[in-house]
UniProtKB/Swiss-Prot annotation:
It comes from Mycolicibacterium paratuberculosis (strain ATCC BAA-968 / K-10). A divalent metal cation binds at residues 12, 14, 46. Pathway: Isoprenoid biosynthesis; isopentenyl diphosphate biosynthesis via DXP pathway; isopentenyl diphosphate from 1-deoxy-D-xylulose 5-phosphate: step 4/6. Belongs to the IspF family. Binds 1 divalent metal cation per subunit. Its EC number is 4.6.1.12. PANTHER family: 2-C-METHYL-D-ERYTHRITOL 2,4-CYCLODIPHOSPHATE SYNTHASE, CHLOROPLASTIC. It comes from the Bacteria. Homotrimer. GO terms for molecular function: 2-C-methyl-D-erythritol 2,4-cyclodiphosphate synthase activity; metal ion binding. This is 2-C-methyl-D-erythritol 2,4-cyclodiphosphate synthase.
Length: 159
């Protein structure tokens, strides 16, 4: 039996949609516009989903949730993470730990970092660290046109 831990990487980018609620890292931010998308536009949760799925060899968010499947329309990033954690467990892995970095100007993640880490860790059943950065005015995130996130995850075989 293979007992080697596996590492995955996930990236997500969405454009800002003025007036849409901002859901990020499993939290609601009242002081910023949210991202457009088939689901809730939570780039942090989506990047984490991709990282876990890729580590477990289960594809990516598009393969699991689709981009136009009505069953997943408007689904929260939190529900997506729950589903990914369950799917990963059914395929013989558990999340060991994960990290996610949000790239954008707003919302400010720092003041709610501990809350986001707690929520995401509960959803995945493993420690999740959260970081944020800007691009110093460069690109779509720097101009405030979108948000991006990159994540890594370690999964461990349970067998």
């Amino acid at each position: 039996m293979n007992t080697t831990p596996r590492i995955g990487l996930g990236v997500d980018v969405h454009p800002i949609q003025p007036g849409r609620p901002c859901r990020l890292l499993g939290l609601l931010f009242d002081d910023a516009d949210g991202c457009a998308g088939h689901s809730d536009g939570d780039v942090g949760a989506h990047a984490l989903c991709d990282a876990v799925l890729s580590a477990a060899g289960l594809g990516d968010v598009g393969a699991v949730f689709g981009v136009d499947d009505p069953r997943w329309a408007g689904v929260s990033g939190a529900d997506m993470l729950r589903h990914v954690a369950d799917l990963t467990a059914r395929h013989g892995f558990r999340v060991g730990n994960a990290a996610v970095q949000v790239i954008g100007n707003r919302p400010k993640v720092g003041p709610r970092r501990a809350e986001a880490q707690r929520v995401l860790s509960e959803l995945l059943g493993a420690p999740v660290s959260v970081a944020a950065t800007t691009t110093d005015g460069l690109g779509l995130t720097g101009r405030g046109e979108g948000l991006a996130a990159i994540a890594t995850a370690l999964v461990v075989p349970t067998g």
